[in-house]
C-alpha cells in the first residue's frame, strides 16, 4: 500500500468508522460535510486518489459505492510503533497481517503488538517479540496489560488501588510506573494473551 497523505488518511478513517458504526459507507456529501470540504466533488477527488493507491474500490452508479480493500486482509493486524496521541489500531500503525488463528489464544487475540524494550524479559517477553493482545478494558490486578499513559503505550503487569495504578515491569533493572488517575490520562488498550517469538510465524 502506498503511503496516504494526512487528508487521505482522514477520509479513509471516516469511511472505515462509518461502515463500522452504520454498516454502510458514507455518501460523498456526508464525507464533505464531516471533513469540511466545500462540495461532494472535493470528496470524490480524495476517493479517486484512495482508489489509485489501492485502499478502496469505487463502485460506479451508487452514492455509497465505496468498498474498503484493506479490510479484506486476513490474519491478525500487527501494530508497530504507535505515534503519540493516536489510536493504537490506526491504519498507519499497522505493519501488516499475520496468518495466526486468533483462537490459539484464550481469550481470542484481536491484534499483535511489536514489543519494544526488555522491561518484561523475566516472563519471556523480549524486545522485538509479537505480543498477542485481546482488546478489552476488563482486566484484573496481576494481569499483563497493554496500557496507555497520556500518550505513551506500554506493556506491564497491572496493580490498581484506588486512584493509583502501578505498572510493574518483569525486569529488576526497570522501575514501576506509578500513575495518578486524578492527574494523568490512563487507558487499558488490551490484555496480553500470548507471545510469538519474532520470526516463528513468518
UniProtKB/Swiss-Prot annotation:
The active site is at residues 119, 156. Keywords: Autocatalytic cleavage, DNA damage, DNA repair, DNA replication, DNA-binding, Hydrolase, Repressor, SOS response, Transcription, Transcription regulation. It catalyses: Hydrolysis of Ala-|-Gly bond in repressor LexA. Pfam families: LexA_DNA_bind, Peptidase_S24. Its EC number is 3.4.21.88. GO terms for molecular function: DNA binding; serine-type endopeptidase activity. It comes from the Bacteria. Coiled coil: none annotated. One of its GO terms (biological process) is DNA repair. The record marks 84-85 as: Cleavage. Residues 28-48 bind DNA. Homodimer. Represses a number of genes involved in the response to DNA damage (SOS response), including recA and lexA. Binds to the 16 bp palindromic sequence 5'-CTGTATATATATACAG-3'. In the presence of single-stranded DNA, RecA interacts with LexA causing an autocatalytic cleavage which disrupts the DNA-binding part of LexA, leading to derepression of the SOS regulon and eventually DNA repair. HAMAP family: LexA. Belongs to the peptidase S24 family. This is LexA repressor. It comes from Escherichia fergusonii (strain ATCC 35469 / DSM 13698 / CCUG 18766 / IAM 14443 / JCM 21226 / LMG 7866 / NBRC 102419 / NCTC 12128 / CDC 0568-73). The lineage of its organism: Bacteria, Pseudomonadati, Pseudomonadota, Gammaproteobacteria, Enterobacterales.
Amino acid at each position: 500500500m502506498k503511503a496516504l497523505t494526512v487528508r487521505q488518511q482522514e477520509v479513509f478513517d471516516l469511511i472505515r468508522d462509518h461502515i463500522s458504526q452504520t454498516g454502510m459507507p458514507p455518501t460523498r456529501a456526508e464525507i464533505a460535510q464531516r471533513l469540511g470540504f466545500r462540495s461532494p466533488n472535493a470528496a470524490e477527488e480524495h476517493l479517486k486518489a484512495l482508489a489509485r493507491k489501492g485502499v478502496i474500490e469505487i463502485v460506479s452508479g451508487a452514492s455509497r459505492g465505496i468498498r474498503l480493500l484493506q479490510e479484506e486482509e486476513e490474519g491478525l493486524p500487527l501494530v508497530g510503533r504507535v505515534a503519540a496521541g493516536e489510536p493504537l489500531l490506526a491504519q498507519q500503525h499497522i505493519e501488516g497481517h499475520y496468518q495466526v488463528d486468533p483462537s490459539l489464544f484464550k481469550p481470542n487475540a484481536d491484534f499483535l503488538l511489536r514489543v519494544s524494550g526488555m522491561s518484561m524479559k523475566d516472563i519471556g517477553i523480549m524486545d522485538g517479540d509479537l505480543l498477542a493482545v485481546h482488546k478489552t478494558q476488563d482486566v484484573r490486578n496481576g494481569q499483563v496489560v497493554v496500557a496507555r499513559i497520556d500518550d505513551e503505550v506500554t506493556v506491564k503487569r497491572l496493580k490498581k488501588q484506588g486512584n493509583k495504578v502501578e505498572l510493574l515491569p518483569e525486569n529488576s533493572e526497570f522501575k514501576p510506573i506509578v500513575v495518578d488517575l486524578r492527574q494523568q490520562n490512563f487507558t487499558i488498550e488490551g490484555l496480553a494473551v500470548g507471545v510469538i517469538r519474532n520470526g516463528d510465524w513468518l
